[in-house]
Amino acid sequence: MTRLKTDIRVAALLKRAQGSGAFAVVLRRGDADAGALWVIVRQGRDLMLYTEQMVMSGARNWYQDGPFDETEMQLRTNKAVDRDPDIWIVEIEHPHGRPFLDGETAKTETAAEVAAKALFRGQ
């Protein structure tokens, strides 16, 4: 299955968000071809984190985690960059917390929900 390059996906995300009146900015540029993508959504003081994960079918799903304060989010992003220097980080500020993610948004789960499902499946 052919995947769009990350820089193209980020450009589309920025266009969707900014076209709807949200503020969106690239906080960190990663590998243009295949860098992982994290999206931070700011709603007031709350920060939600959306990360992409590849699932067994080969599809990519978004997972939501948070809310976090500024300090916790900075710690998370710093650790992510240390582990993966190719990562992209985009921040979107929207009054209703809309993430503007692409069509792969059908499944959003918190990290705790993912862990619980894995536990009950015996993994």
Could you describe each region identified by the protein language model?
Residues 1-123:
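Polybasic/polar functional segments that serve as interface/processing modules
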